[in-house]
């Protein structure tokens, strides 16, 4: 799954013809412990391009948590991001649709709005990890 994600991100990065891109990763331990930001940066470097990364990946964090997390908001507000990768807590997307509609979508929308407010040219990338039981 990580290989597909990295390939999609690299395709998006290189399709714009710029050598340097800025990517912010907001997620939790699935992104942080697996060091996805650094791995993506290394793969990008192997193509001769540069990826400037930053992240906030506290364990168990949700979109709701990131939408009010001072560190996440400050990093978004720094602006000039080309991509902001959002990763929801691993179980939430598998919950009943009513729960997801109430506890996931509004915060994904809120984060995306904040991202676009401070980074009008950014693309929000939703990264879904494998489910956890």
Predicted segments, located by residue:
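Sec-dependent N-terminal signal peptides
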Residues: 4-13
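Short, glycine/serine-rich, charged loops/turns that create anion-binding
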Residues: 11, 30, 131
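Short, solvent-exposed loop/turn elements at domain surfaces
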Residues: 32-34, 61-66
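Acidic helix-start/capping segments at beta-turn-to-alpha-helix junctions
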Residues: 55-63, 129-132
């Amino acid at each position: 799954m990580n290989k597909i994600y990295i390939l999609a991100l690299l395709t998006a990065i290189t399709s714009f013809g710029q050598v340097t891109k800025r990517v912010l990763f907001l997620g939790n331990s699935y992104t942080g412990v697996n060091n996805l930001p650094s791995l993506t940066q290394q793969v990008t470097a192997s193509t001769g391009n540069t990826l400037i990364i930053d992240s906030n990946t506290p364990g168990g964090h949700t979109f709701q948590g990131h939408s009010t997390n001072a560190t996440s908001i400050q990093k978004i507000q720094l602006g000039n991001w080309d991509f902001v990768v959002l990763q929801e807590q691993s179980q939430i997307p598998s919950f009943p649709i009513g729960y997801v509609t109430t506890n996931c979508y509004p915060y994904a929308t809120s984060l995306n709005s904040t991202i676009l407010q401070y980074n009008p040219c950014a693309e929000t990338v939703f990264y879904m990890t494998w489910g956890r039981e």
